Amino acid sequence: MNNLIKYSTFLISDLFDVVIGKTIDGNKAQRNENGTPYITRKATRNGFEFMIDGEKEKLYSGKLPVITIGNETSKPFVQEFHFFTGTKVNICIPKLDLNRNHLLYITTMIENATKMFSYSYTINSTRLKSLKILLPIKGEEPDWDYMNTYISKILSNMEKNFDVQQNDGVSDLRSLKDLSWSQFKMDEIFSINSGVRLTKADMKPGNIPFIGATDSNNGITEFTSSTNASFDGNVLGVNYNGSVVENFYHPYKAVFSDDVKRLKLKNYPNNKHVLLFMKVVILQQKVKYAYGYKFNATRMKEQIILLPTKADGTPDYEFMEQYMMRMENKVVGRTTEKEAD
């Protein structure tokens, strides 16, 4: 928090109209990959569950962007597209014309203010309306320019490390069922390196992502200027502690907690698409591990994973890359179509 900026508290009800979703059972709805997002109270993936075809009268089709907050999880997310959601999700509709950056700033303030809530004491719409959050001010009003600039700088620093999104060329159109699959130890596929312990007391504020053992925010738990031997990029960060087996791809340079292992491919150039394929493969092992049964380096090296293979029995990295390019192209195409509407 900037010590030169003045702050004041505001009620959520001063800033937002709070409504709840409609009665809808997403599990019974018709799933359609070209449908509309179904947002739930989950604390990950921006609340996104899957795409569905739902009844139009139950669609949130109002002002955008908005913030959604699940009752039990109290996790706020910014939604920029219209969506379906149920009665356990609160929709915060800005009373002013606020942009994504404003709402991203506010979600952080909401998270700071909702730590007292839990599954036994949920943040329903009544409690949410009376929730107080701390915001920077200019005079007596929220300093929207400061919030917008602050988030813009953070996003700009991160986006410098990403390639410009484009529709990748794909030549391999095989499906997963068309392939041969074989078992491999993770140690055959990856170099596995540890993170380094960095305590809050030793952590200095900055713009370098700090990767912790969380299941959300792409693993980012803080931003720091402190670096150590774990400073790395273009890797998979795999949690061996905390939210065990959860893993995220980090194209940007980051500092990694000692609860997170850094994985790089041994026999193929590290790239976003192959590592994202591996992310899903590794997540299939999550059911085996828990807080009392850590996914430590020894177990990680011996863990068996199933991968598509070539005729010679080696992993088909080229297919993995092409397959994830296809998935990415679908998302890029869908997003472009919605932005054009």
UniProtKB/Swiss-Prot annotation:
At the highest ranks, the source species' classification is:
Bacteria, Bacillati, Bacillota, Bacilli, Bacillales
Q: What is the species of this protein?
A: Heyndrickxia coagulans (Weizmannia coagulans)
Can you tell me which residues the record assigns to a coiled coil? none
Q: Which reaction is catalysed here?
A: Endonucleolytic cleavage of DNA to give specific double-stranded fragments with terminal 5'-phosphates
Task: Write out the entry's keywords from A to Z.
Answer: DNA-binding, Endonuclease, Hydrolase, Magnesium, Nuclease, Restriction system
Q: Which cofactor does it need?
A: Mg(2+)
The record describes the protein's role as:
The specificity subunit. A B, G, H and S subtype restriction enzyme that recognizes the double-stranded sequence 5'-CGAN(6)TGC-3' and cleaves bilaterally and symmetrically 10 base pairs upstream and 12 base pairs downstream of the sequence to release a 34-base pair fragment. Methylation of the recognition sequence occurs on the adenine in either one or both strands; seems to methylate restricted DNA. This subunit degrades DNA in a non-specific manner.
Question: What is the protein name stated in its UniProt record?
Answer: Type II restriction enzyme BgcI specificity subunit S.BcgI
Any keyword Magnesium? yes
Q: Which domain of life is it from?
A: Bacteria
Q: Which gene is transcribed and translated to give this protein?
A: bcgIB
Kindly list the biological process annotations in GO that this record carries: DNA restriction-modification system
User: Looking at the Swiss-Prot or TrEMBL record, what is one Pfam family this protein matches?
Assistant: Methylase_S
Family stated for the protein in its record: Belongs to the type-I restriction system S methylase family.
Quaternary structure, from the entry: Heterotrimer of two A and one B subunit. Both subunits are necessary for DNA-binding, which is sequence non-specific.
For this chain, one GO molecular function annotation is: DNA binding
What the record says about activity regulation is: DNA restriction requires S-adenosyl-L-methionine and Mg(2+), and is inhibited by S-adenosyl-homocysteine. SAM may be a cofactor for DNA restriction.
The EC number(s) this enzyme carries: 3.1.21.4
